Amino acid sequence: GLFDIVKKIAGHIAGSI
C-alpha cells in the first residue's frame, strides 16, 4: 500500500546516510 512506498523511501534515505 501507500505506507509500503513511504517505508521504502524512508529505507532508501536511511541507507544513504
Swiss-Prot record:
Tissues in which the UniProt entry reports expression: Expressed by the skin dorsal glands.
Modified residues (Isoleucine amide): I17
Subcellular compartments: Secreted
UniProt record, GO biological process: defense response to bacterium
Database matches in InterPro entries: Aurein_antimicrobial_peptide (IPR013157)
Main location: secreted
Function statement: Has antimicrobial activity against L.lactis, L.innocua, M.luteus, S.aureus, S.epidermidis and S.uberis. Probably acts by disturbing membrane functions with its amphipathic structure. Shows anticancer activity.
Protein name: Aurein-3.1
